[in-house]
Amino acid sequence: MTKLGFLRLSYEKQDTLLKLLILSMAAVLSFSTRLFAVLRFESVIHEFDPYFNYRTTRFLAEEGFYKFHNWFDDRAWYPLGRIIGGTIYPGLMITSAAIYHVLHFFHITIDIRNVCVFLAPLFSSFTTIVTYHLTKELKDAGAGLLAAAMIAVVPGYISRSVAGSYDNEGIAIFCMLLTYYMWIKAVKTGSIYWAAKCALAYFYMVSSWGGYVFLINLIPLHVLVLMLTGRFSHRIYVAYCTVYCLGTILSMQISFVGFQPVLSSEHMAAFGVFGLCQIHAFVDYLRSKLNPQQFEVLFRSVISLVGFVLLTVGALLMLTGKISPWTGRFYSLLDPSYAKNNIPIIASVSEHQPTTWSSYYFDLQLLVFMFPVGLYYCFSNLSDARIFIIMYGVTSMYFSAVMVRLMLVLAPVMCILSGIGVSQVLSTYMKNLDISRPDKKSKKQQDSTYPIKNEVASGMILVMAFFLITYTFHSTWVTSEAYSSPSIVLSARGGDGSRIIFDDFREAYYWLRHNTPEDAKVMSWWDYGYQITAMANRTILVDNNTWNNTHISRVGQAMASTEEKAYEIMRELDVSYVLVIFGGLTGYSSDDINKFLWMVRIGGSTDTGKHIKEHDYYTPTGEFRVDREGSPVLLNCLMYKMCYYRFGQVYTEAKRPPGFDRVRNAEIGNKDFELDVLEEAYTTEHWLVRIYKVKDLDNRGLSRT
């Protein structure tokens, strides 16, 4: 089409083409901005959980769904093992395997690893499109395009969707927004068609991420608010009843979910609102058949009876255990101190910590300030759909403050409401912008408005443009510097500004894979379990699934005990090798010494570890120190000795004594010691990973060789 031909198109067609072009550019930007890690390093899986997801996806692609669904993994949680098919959300793996097989059907040969690496950026592009349609339903196409452009680069979402971040959240945010879009369409139309599509989107969400619980509580809450505000109608009744019935039946097809939608407390709100819908419909029917006096007497009687019966039945079901109580993670959302005081394994995960104020600006920047503007617009122009987005924004704001991981749930609604806010500000001032030539304006036109209306409008538009540009630069910088570094490969800047690569993790796992027996059992802290099984292909005792607190506690007890007591535990668990992460030489702060207090807390949280007390590992003044002032219990435990073995002879910095720990900024207190029950098997180039072999007893069990 020539340029002249384009200009001859009708205004509507030009408008459509321009929207399509902008939306396509946002989708391409969303994909490309997540590729920093691939360009800087290589096509590699990030973090810890993604390695398990990659391993299971590879098994599914090679062996098929039947074997995948019935897979018993004997490489994990030795000697217990783990049933894979019934303990995971399979949506991520099935999606990747389906894409892999479709590409191979068309003779596009691509490794399953590369499918996994690029899946999250691909779905982030789909998310921009869904965000556009969702925001368009709330305001207009202009707001939708702004929201799509914002979510394409928002760091709060990019943090879990960069190339290589192969985790459930990579596709779950798309599923969540798709479900919300279908729900709003169902609410607006009252159509079973849209409600059924919403149920299907919800089913995809359930199959992909445990965060579906937020969704199945938010939608009923929306319906309840519509009831309380007098907005409940036949449209809402049809939409919710269809979504709840179909969605519940479909969600129960996921093995890991099973009967939870009708048995667990997290799902009871949805069931209760479903019952309220039936009562509301019945009351409306009675109102149409009875006079006001009869209706009031009957209404009070029925409500009292139904309320009493429901409370009695609910209490009995809770007491008899037919309805399971809330899980620890759910309790920790309602009471942030619950996990810290009762379940240290949950509190030990960095993702479960409360969010700091600085994190909001770091992950959202401009959106923090434009979110209230969009919220104000929705309050000023209330509708059923806008009530939903208000509730989504307010609830996700609270939950993101309780748990930093849920910043991911907040980011999309921040983009939507900020897109609405920016669109409203720009459209308001654009109306005041007069682009006609000054010499052609009549004196009457000039005097009819305040003198500087045009200048104020121009200034505000320039200010908003500046804010949007700074938002883009900030998001790109955060993506590049903070969220595009795979934890499996570390990097740092040298004195001359060049990039230094630390590839110790893969070096260690490669050594394990090729230099240890295939049936070797490796003991490490649970953080590294998935990586060891995926990359070293060796049996591990605990991993990131953390389903058995007692087993993890036993590992923590071994790490926190003296060599003799630890040896008894290691022999009990048939351990062949022990792996620890140590950052004292390179300055890597996420090492096992810094995680050690969590090992102590978790180790002492069970009956077999009651003798382990956290205060024993502190100095008399309450400090955790690794130097000569440190606690003797700490300086003689297994973890300390494995990390600092031979370290007392190493010079780490100029003008510092040997054995100077660059993370703790201290000279270690216990330098001259030998290991009795372990022998050093391998230490990586930068001492980041240290592997020890457990010595065997001699034939009579009198000494170790």
UniProtKB/Swiss-Prot annotation:
Subcellular localization(s) per the UniProt record: Endoplasmic reticulum membrane
Principal cellular location given in the protein's record: endoplasmic reticulum
Alphabetized InterPro entries for the sequence: AglB-like_core, Oligo_trans_STT3, STT3_N
Its EC number(s): 2.4.99.18
Keyword hit for Transferase: yes
Catalytic activity field: a di-trans,poly-cis-dolichyl diphosphooligosaccharide + L-asparaginyl-[protein] = N(4)-(oligosaccharide-(1->4)-N-acetyl-beta-D-glucosaminyl-(1->4)-N-acetyl-beta-D-glucosaminyl)-L-asparaginyl-[protein] + a di-trans,poly-cis-dolichyl diphosphate + H(+)
Transmembrane segments: 16-34, 112-141, 143-158, 171-188, 192-207, 211-229, 235-253, 266-283, 299-317, 357-379, 386-402, 407-428, 454-473
Membrane topology: Multi-pass membrane protein
Domain of life: Eukaryota
Family the entry assigns: Belongs to the STT3 family.
Name of the molecule in the record: Dolichyl-diphosphooligosaccharide--protein glycosyltransferase subunit STT3A
Gene behind this protein: STT3A
